[in-house]
Amino acid sequence: MATRGTTSKSKTELAEEMDNMGAKYSAHSDREYTRFSLQVHSGDAARAVNMLGDMVCNNSLNSAELELVKDEVSAEHEDNHNRYQETTLENAHFNSFREHMLGQPIKGDRDLTHTIGVDHLKDFHTANYYGDNIIVVATGDVSHEQVVDAVQQNFHSLPKTTSVQ
């Protein structure tokens, strides 16, 4: 949902801004983390941090976009279900960890995907997206001070810790 729009930019505006920078965006979720990255020219590092901060801190969590994502996830579930290696790994994790989060499918329970709503995403965001739980990394010929300033400027709205127990 990160690239589906923010409170200040539509998904089209986000895509155009990335294209104008020549940015390469990627996102990946695993059992223990979610990673968002923008690969840009060194002169655009602060701008990239600004975009990532906007996507993480100001995500619009639009219900129409959520429905599109749920359709995509359902299709991925079906595709993965037909891949024996993926199914075997999911089953191995479930049987090893059962009720622990590590035992749950990365993309969620395929029978429950359709029940997820915007409120679920907001609760997940509140519980997991906070200062102590986020790492921002910049590599290459970038100004450390500019990156630190950009992080402080663009991620300041997140609480330092979570209030969710």
Locate predicted features.
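Charge-rich, well-structured scaffold segments of protease-associated domains
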Residues: E13-V164
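Active-site SXXK
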Residues: M1-T6
